[in-house]
A protein has these predicted regions:
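Residues within mature, well-folded domains
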Residues: 1-93
């Protein structure tokens, strides 16, 4: 998986999450497209990504409502166009 600049608008949560830290995600994907780690919004971080096959997905924290430490492992949501894509992403992590 890699970060993408393709349009991920329309992806949604299909029940799949990954348990990982912000630091691990930055090492894996680079800096997030959105970073507002103040806990005031539903999302502090998100990445737009694609699989090796070009399937689009997003990774984001959801409703933590607090600043997140770079080293703290939390559940990040996977947003995608289908359940199959989000399951594929989850299985690779």
């Amino acid at each position: 998986m890699k970060k993408t600049h393709k349009d991920t608008c329309g992806t949604s949560f299909h029940g799949d999450t990954i348990f990982i830290s912000v630091e691990e995600l930055i090492n894996l994907l680079g800096e997030p497209q959105f970073q507002e780690n103040d806990g005031n919004d539903k999302v502090n971080y998100y990445w737009d990504c694609e699989t090796e096959d070009g399937e689009l997905f997003t990774i984001y924290d959801w409703k933590e409502y607090r600043p997140i430490s770079d080293f703290e492992k939390i559940e990040f949501h996977i947003g995608s166009f289908t359940k199959e894509i989000s399951e594929k992403v989850k299985s690779k992590n």
